[in-house]
């Protein structure tokens, strides 16, 4: 199951890299033309939505506890700045925990064991609509990054607004589960930042570049969320495998 989760991440990477290059190039071109891009505009932050990815079940060591504690710490920091915070919970464990403590939960989604583009799209469509309407000023992803079969790391990534380049891949790692001497080991490879595609100044687009950007952005955001779902599921599976091994 961990191998399948790994393969899912690796299969989507070439498409993601190409999409990031085109996206970066379009943003660069539109900025040069002084076109306003709402998804890149930093605005006064009043409300922050935290998308918290946890599991639907227990018996997976401290996997759920780590992400819940990370979320509580982030909520505390944001409230100390005088900001309103709401949650979008992906996974039953976080949803039940925070609702019992009367933390505002905006929406709940089950966490699929084999995340698909459709799963991610159902979440990102709502998040994007809320951001563009001005109802939400910042959206962050809280997920569990896969480090090794016995180690995972609760992490935070900003989904919206986008960074000035539109790219959020710096420091990304791809994990690969391999077998050495009959034992499972995890090898990780740091992913280089995808440099923006350089479009010639006299290049003519069949469609307006802004229309192209508006069509690509949902795909990009969907890919970012799908990646975090896949990483979280792999971390949960590894934590469950480790917990079962310790119990036996």
Language model region names:
Residues 1-248:
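C-terminal beta-strand-loop-alpha-helix "lid" module of Rossmann-like NAD(P)-dependent dehydrogenases
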């Amino acid at each position: 199951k961990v191998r399948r989760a790994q393969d899912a991440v690796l299969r989507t990477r070439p498409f993601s890299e190409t999409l990031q290059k085109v996206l970066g190039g379009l943003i660069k071109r539109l900025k040069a033309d002084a076109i306003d891009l709402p998804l890149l505009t930093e605005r006064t932050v009043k409300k922050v939505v935290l998308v918290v990815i946890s599991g639907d079940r227990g018996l997976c060591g401290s996997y759920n506890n780590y992400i819940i504690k990370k979320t509580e710490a982030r909520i505390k920091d944001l409230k100390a700045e005088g900001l309103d915070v709401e949650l979008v919970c992906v996974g039953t464990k976080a949803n039940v925990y925070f609702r019992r403590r009367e933390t505002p939960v905006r929406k709940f989604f089950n966490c699929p064991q084999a995340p698909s583009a459709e799963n991610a799209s159902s979440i990102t469509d709502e998040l994007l609509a809320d951001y563009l309407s001005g109802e939400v000023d910042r959206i962050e992803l809280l997920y569990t990054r896969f480090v090794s079969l016995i180690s995972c790391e609760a992490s935070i990534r900003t989904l919206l607004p986008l960074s000035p380049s539109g790219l959020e891949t710096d420091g990304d790692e791809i994990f690969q589960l391999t077998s050495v001497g009959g034992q499972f080991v995890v090898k990780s490879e740091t992913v280089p930042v995808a440099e923006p595609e350089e479009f010639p100044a006299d290049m003519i687009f069949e469609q307006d570049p802004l229309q192209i950007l508006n069509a690509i952005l949902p795909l990009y955001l969907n890919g970012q969320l799908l990646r975090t779902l896949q990483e979280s599921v792999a971390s949960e599976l590894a934590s469950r495998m480790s917990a079962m091994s310790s119990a036996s």
